[in-house]
Every structure is written in structure tokens, then in C-alpha cells.
């Protein structure tokens, strides 16, 4: 039997230079826990997997709103593993993430890796709406197959709107049923870990960063708006995380300068 679950959270200023969480509701495999934040102004929420999910046929969703002036970090306790499940005829699973960030608000969306296990079929969508003065740090990582196995079928789409205008709309597809060439030299070139880091900040509107390579398999691209996108591929999850962490530190240091 397939699972349908939606987790919801809402962050708002608490009136004491911090952030409150008036809505923090998990469901099914999506458990939400408030955890300690090293930054006083930020609330921190950790997503904890309460059961194996998604399996083919499951419908999962996370909805998060960061209201004007609030600061929120969302991370995860472990990787998400897309699994085939017991029914070979099941529909693809879906996982939808919907994020809204208000004026002067900050969201750090930093989940762990998404692993596409052999035989799984997942459609993942992330939709983000940013107010004109909102700030966003978003990381996505996909690992194509567990150790020693081929990947499942995985389609991801990330759409971001800033001040009501499109900032980014990117769709990626891997594995069985994906358009030809997804594993060719122009796309993954045999790598099995792919990720991206999106940083949106109003300061980039006045001083955009130049496009440049960050290494043999990573690049930074300024977007048509106050944001930059780092994309990277690597042989495994550890190497990918190292590249994205280094890029994150460099970008955050740039904002502090």
C-alpha cells in the first residue's frame, strides 16, 4: 500500500531577535524535529525519516514558509533513499518541496543526499518563491545508485521565482527512460554523484559574480537575477559534498566581505 504524507512548517520572528516555529507538523515518514542552531537568530529544523520512503507509488511533500524577517535552517538526519517497493507495477513515487521566503527572511535549505536505488522511479519537484529582499541557500545532491548497483529512474525539477519573476527552471533526468545521452561525455561522463548549490542574495543584483570554473567538474554561473548557481559532478557522494561545501564557504565569505 502506498504512503501519502505532507510535512508542514512555518517560521516567524519571535519578537526577541530570534525565530519561532508556530507550525511544525510531520506526517508518516516525514518527522520534523526542532534542533539546536549555532546562530541565535535562526530556528533549525531537522527532517528525520520515520520509515523507509519513498517507495514506488508513494506521494510525499514538504511545505515550508519563512515569513518576513524570520531566519530558518532546515537539514536532515540522513540521506533519502528512493526504493522500488514490493509492487513491480506501482506508479512512480513523487516528492514535492514547496518553499516560500518573505521580505528580509533567510532560508538555508540543506537536506542530505537523495539516493536513487536500482528499480526505483522517483519524480522530485522543488518550487521556491522569494520576496525581493529574501535570501536563500539551497543545496541538492543526487546519488545515482547505491554502491555497486545501477541507478534507478530519477527526474528532478527545480523552479525558483524571485519577486514574481522566473529566476531558475531546471529539469534533470537520469536512468531508465531518461533521454539518451544523460550518462554521456556532455552530461555526467560516467560520474554517479551530481549536485547544485543555489545562493540568492539581494547584493548580487548590484555586484554579480563572474562565471568561472571551480575545478575540473564544477562551475559557478551567475543567474539573470540576484543569485548564483554552482553545479558539480563527482565519482561519489563524499567528493561531491566536499566540492559543494568548499563553494558554500567561499560564497558566504564573499557576502561577508
UniProtKB/Swiss-Prot annotation:
Q: Where in the cell is it found?
A: Cytoplasm
Any one Gene Ontology molecular-function term assigned to this protein's record:
nickel cation binding
Q: Which keywords does this Swiss-Prot/TrEMBL entry list?
A: Chaperone, Cytoplasm, Nickel insertion
A GO-annotated cellular component: cytoplasm
**Record-linked InterPro entries:** UreD (IPR002669)
* Coiled-coil boundaries: none
Q: Where is this region: Disordered?
A: 1-22
Q: Entry's Pfam families?
A: UreD
Query: Its biological function?
Result: Required for maturation of urease via the functional incorporation of the urease nickel metallocenter.
Subunit description: UreD, UreF and UreG form a complex that acts as a GTP-hydrolysis-dependent molecular chaperone, activating the urease apoprotein by helping to assemble the nickel containing metallocenter of UreC. The UreE protein probably delivers the nickel.
Give the similarity note: Belongs to the UreD family.
Protein name from the UniProt record: Urease accessory protein UreD 3
